[in-house]
Structures are given as structure tokens and as C-alpha cells.
Amino acid sequence: MSRTTNWNPVTYARDARFVADLGKPLLELLAPKKGEVVMDLGCGDGALTEKIAQGVSVIGADTSFAQARAAQERGLPIVVVDGHHLCFKRRFDAVFTNAAIHWMQRPEKIVQEVWLSLKTAGRFIGEFGAKGNVETVRSALHKGLRRRGIDPLALDPWYFPTAEDFSKLLIKANFTVRSIEIIERPTQLPGGLLDWLEIFAQPFTNAIEKNQRRSFLNEVCERSETALRDANERWTLDYVRLRFAAVKLEE
């Protein structure tokens, strides 16, 4: 069974544009300076990368060929690369990442690769899911799989740490943590929960027979609606984010 997600730039832009829109405050934390070279790690379709590129030299990095192509169509330089194996050495003044680290299975390796990619005193600026992120839906997904005799822990793709746990990873990799905070950010979806699940819950649904997947997703929606859907049938997910800024120490 696979934890792979097949990213579709069209449906992502339609149903998940809020991911980039809500990442805009992170650009202020990045505060890029003229002449800097920045990597956007997990750049997706390049919506935020494009904004960074207005002031500095930027390279987007993503594992998805489809998303990389969408970013390239914006005129951005993109590399298709696994964040666990970046293969850059002291190249960047800053590494920026939004809503990507929680998809990466070995966060300690990611942090090490970012450290190697940065120049001395380079900045690592990011935001991703924290402990408790989308907990209602995650719990419903797990329950639905267990009911079908499938171990959800073998499929769950998400890494949602506490601030303390992620701070320890940064310090161990020889970063100085300038700031780290947990932000509770209830997020209203542009469409229904089903649209969100079809994008983000693929590692769970891939374990279900194709002719049973819609039934499984409907069950997840039913388990979640009391907590997440209001009287006007608008869905608001219990997003919790971890936002951080760290600096690479002297080598």
C-alpha cells in the first residue's frame, strides 16, 4: 500500500488555492532582500514562488512533475527533486516552505538537507501542519479504514509535530530557532469536504477498492459533519499550523 498523492494542478488550483493564499503572511517572515537566492521547498504550482520571485532570484523544488510543470508555466525555474535528497551545497540565502513538510516522511532528513543547502547564516522559514491539524477528518479516515480491516497508520502520510518536537530537530541539525509558534486557524473550504478529501486523502483512499471509494469518503463526511459543517452547509476544517524561523549556525 502506498502513501503517494497524485497532485492535479487543475483541481488543486480550483479547490485548494486557499493553501497558498493563507501562506502570504509567511512571505513577511521571509522578508527577502534584493540579490538573495531563495529556494521554495515544496513549491507546488508556484503560486507563492511567483510572489517571492518579484524581489529575488528563486528556485522552486517539488516532487510532483505535474505541479512542477504548472509552476514552469508561470515562467519560474523549477527542479523536480525529493526534499530528502536536495543535493545542493551552501547555495541559498534562504529556504522557504509552506504546507509541505507535513507530507515528508523523514523530517529530520529534510532539516539536514536544508541545512546543507543554505549558506552560513542562511534562513529557514516555514509553515506546515502541527499536532491536532485536521484532527476531526483524520480521525474519521482512521476509523473508516479500521472498520474495513485496514491499518491506517501504515497509510497515514502526515507529520504533525508539536513546536517542541520540531524545535529539537532544528537545534539538532545546528540551527538557531529565532521563532516558532502554533497557530490555530479554522479554515473554511471553498467547496465541500468531499472535494478536499479527493485531493488530500488519496493515500487513505488508495487502499480502498475503486468501486467502494465514494462510499468510504461519504462515510468520512458523515462522521465529520457535526463538528465541521454549519447550518449553511459550509465546511470549516480544524487547521492548526506550526510557523517557524531558524538560522543556520556557523559550520
Q: Whereabouts are the PLM-identified features?
A:
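Conserved class I S-adenosyl-L-methionine
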Residues: 1-36, 47-51, 67, 125-148
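Class I SAM-dependent methyltransferase SAM/SAH-binding core
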Residues: 39-86
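A short acidic, Gly/Pro-enriched loop at the edge of an enzyme's catalytic core
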Residues: 84-95
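A short SAM/SAH-binding and catalytic strip from SAM-dependent methyltransferases
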Residues: 94-107
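A short glycine-rich, Lys/Arg-flanked "PGG" loop and its adjoining helix->strand segment in the class I
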Residues: 108-123
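Short alpha-helix
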Residues: 158-173
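C-terminal helical/coil "lid" or tail adjacent to the Rossmann-like core of SAM-dependent
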Residues: 178-232
